[in-house]
């Protein structure tokens, strides 16, 4: 695991954060929700433990969004410019879906998978050789063992603390 610290921020710079280490896994999500929420063709989300994202300036506010599943989806945005910085799903604040393009080095982490490609815009060309899923995927089959162990440790820690 990388102990590299990277910084990121919202569009206006009112919220700044540090990312401690690499994401467990990176999604390029082509679902309609991500398209509408970002105003783009897809969202690039790095899944990482909440405790590895350190906000050191400003404070993003969660905006609750409806989902098909019925589970809450909170998008954390800058209150000044409304840039989305990360999400959590189902109230799992211990797991962040960090918008990697908000990093000062947005190309630091390439997507591991492209998901919800059933709603991919027709003019988006996927790189040759990437793993592609029309919907979601089986984490146990796709995630590296180290990432699965990190996920389990974060989940267990969150469960133990209430």
Task: Label each residue range with its predicted role.
Residues 1-9, 14-162:
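A short Gly-Trp-Pro
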